[in-house]
From Swiss-Prot:
Residues 296-332 form the LDL-receptor class A domain. Accessory subunit of neuronal kainate-sensitive glutamate receptors, GRIK2 and GRIK3. Increases kainate-receptor channel activity, slowing the decay kinetics of the receptors, without affecting their expression at the cell surface, and increasing the open probability of the receptor channels. Modulates the agonist sensitivity of kainate receptors. Slows the decay of kainate receptor-mediated excitatory postsynaptic currents (EPSCs), thus directly influencing synaptic transmission. The keyword Ion transport does not apply. The gene is NETO2. Interacts with GRIK2 and GRIK3, but neither with AMPA-nor with NMDA-sensitive glutamate receptors. The modification Phosphoserine is found at S409. Coiled coil: none annotated. This is Neuropilin and tolloid-like protein 2. Residues 45-159, 177-292 form the CUB domain. It comes from Homo sapiens (Human). Disulfide bonds join C45-C72, C100-C122, C177-C207, C234-C256, C297-C309, C304-C322, C316-C331. N-glycosylated. It is a single-pass type I membrane protein. The chain crosses the membrane at residues 348-368. The keyword Transmembrane applies.
Length: 525
């Protein structure tokens, strides 16, 4: 009995184990069947496989019918100096329509939706072989709300570009050339490639600049300088802008003509790519990037009036960071950096040494000049003669009437004697003429004659003395009454001689240092 019960328990346990193991095996089998199958989100368009030499892609749900109201875009990119070759499988069906107005497949020669159109395809027949003229191809699949079909499956591969056969065919591997920038603003420069020697002279340029904005910000790009050596030849040189990553799907703009416009990115990561072949090394660009947030603006940001808020540190910094120059309007002109602000450490050292040398020489010169005059003054004091300086610098002392008393009295005595003799002679001559002639006309002539005689007498008297420089002149006037003779006939002109005015100018001259004086007498009637 006990053995039978034990056997029954073992059977139950065995059955339970087998059931559990069976369930586990079934679960593993189901999981194994799901390996390699990827659930495609509703927003993704089919399967796309990429390789270094090409790849393949298909319409959504291929080989089943594609969904209605679907739009998928595929952008193919080859390596530099290569083209793209596109082929389709035979299992192909897209709703046919006139000029493919409804469901269709659109292929363009380039990376954009506005690139040259190659053709539109629909119907039951697969498209022929398609080749691009450059390294990009833009493909769009579109379906409407009715009549879905099988769809398509396409393969693409990269082939050498025959336009570059003169350069040796396929391009040699280009060295890594990448740069990173971040912050509120900054400048992307193509000249950085040569400065950091990322490429060798004569080598093609294929460089990437990755820009990271400040947190929660987007990026605004503005070209400060732009020049393509071969304009409108995108195969040879271009500047491309990507929004979010360097993937071809995120290509925002591409410039290879003569003009480059501003670009607003929707994310905080921007990628700038420059391509220039060996013959386009003169191509260059310089680009300003600015981090911005959308309004409303905070206290730490500035409103640019163009749906932009930039950091306050970028206002009035001499650079236009807004799309319009609102941030640089109403700014006070900043003073230019002074001379001392521009002096570097080396300049300061040179100026300091030079100034020290000049200062030492100046001090030595001052000491020499201070000591030298003192010696000269000491030498002059020993040879100083007060008497000589007294004679040279003291003015001469003049005394009026410094004649000796004897000489003055003798001169005055001689002068008075001469005057008396002259008066007597004059009276006698006048009286005799008036008595004998009995007229007054002769008296006038006698007066004239007397004056003539007086002048003749005066000349030798004045010539006795030389004419030195006069020092002072004084006049002595003597009034004397004239004698009148009453004759039988009165003379009317005799009244002129009632008074005799005698002026005796005395002039004193000093000759040299001698105290001698001379006098001259002039008598006028």
């Amino acid at each position: 009995m006990a053995l039978e019960r034990l056997c029954s328990v073992l059977k139950v346990l065995l059955i339970t184990v087998l059931v559990v193991e069976g369930i586990a095996v079934a679960q593993k089998t189901q999981d194994g069947q799901n390996i390699g199958i990827k659930h495609i989100p509703a927003t993704q368009c089919g399967i796309w496989v990429r390789t270094s030499n090409g790849g393949h892609f298909a319409s959504p749900n291929y080989p089943d019918s594609y969904p209605p109201n679907k739009e998928c875009i595929y952008i193919l990119e080859a390596a530099p100096r290569q083209r793209i070759e596109l082929t389709f499988d035979e299992h192909y069906y897209i709703e046919p329509s006139f000029e493919c107005r409804f469901d269709h497949l659109e292929v363009r020669d380039g990376p954009f939706g506005f690139s040259p159109l190659i053709d539109r395809y629909c119907g039951v027949k697969s498209p022929p072989l398609i080749r691009s003229t450059g390294r990009f191809m833009w493909i769009k699949f579109s379906s409407d709300e009715e009549l879905e079909g099988l769809g398509f499956r396409a393969k693409y591969s990269f082939i050498p570009d025959p336009d570059f056969t003169y350069l040796g065919g396929i391009l040699n591997p280009i060295p890594d050339c990448q740069f990173e920038l971040s912050g509120a603003d900054g400048i992307v420069r193509s000249s950085q490639v040569e400065q950091e020697e990322k490429t060798k002279p004569g080598q093609a340029v294929d460089c990437i600049w990755t820009i990271k904005a400040t947190p929660k910000a987007k990026i605004y790009l503005r070209f400060l300088d732009y020049q393509m050596e071969h304009s409108n030849e995108c195969k040879r040189n271009f500047v491309a802008v990507y929004d979010g990553s360097s993937s071809i799907e995120n290509l925002k703009a591409k410039f290879c003509s003569t003009v480059a416009n501003d670009v607003m990115l929707k994310t905080g990561i921007g990628v700038i790519r420059m391509w220039a072949d060996e013959g386009s090394r003169l191509s260059r660009f310089r680009m300003l990037f600015t981090s911005f947030v959308e309004p409303p603006c905070t206290s730490s940001t500035f409103f640019c009036h163009s749906n932009m808020c930039i950091n306050n540190s970028l206002v009035c910094n001499g650079v236009q960071n807004c799309a319009y120059p609102w941030d640089e309007n109403h700014c006070k002109e900043k003073k230019k950096a002074g001379v001392f602000e521009q002096i570097t450490k080396t300049h300061g050292t040179i100026i300091g040494i030079t100034s020290g040398i000049v200062l030492v020489l100046l001090i030595i010169s001052i000491l020499v000049q201070v000591k030298q005059p003192r010696k000269k003054v000491m030498a002059c004091k020993t040879a100083f003669n007060k008497t000589g300086f007294q004679e040279v610098f003291d003015p001469p002392h003049y005394e009026l009437f410094s004649l000796r008393d004897k000489e003055i009295s003798a001169d005055l005595a001689d002068l008075s004697e001469e005057l008396d003799n002259y008066q007597k002679m004059r009276r006698s001559s006048t009286a005799s003429r008036c008595i004998h002639d009995h007229h007054c006309g002769s008296q006038a002539s006698s007066v004239k004659q007397s004056r003539t005689n007086l002048s003749s007498m005066e000349l030798p008297f004045r010539n006795d003395f030389a004419q030195p420089q006069p020092m002072k002149t004084f006049n002595s006037t003597f009034k004397k009454s004239s004698y009148t003779f009453k004759q039988g006939h009165e003379c009317p002109e005799q009244a002129l001689e009632d008074r005799v005015m005698e002026e005796i100018p005395c002039e004193i001259y000093v000759r040299g240092r001698e105290d001698s004086a001379q006098a001259s007498i002039s008598i006028d009637f």
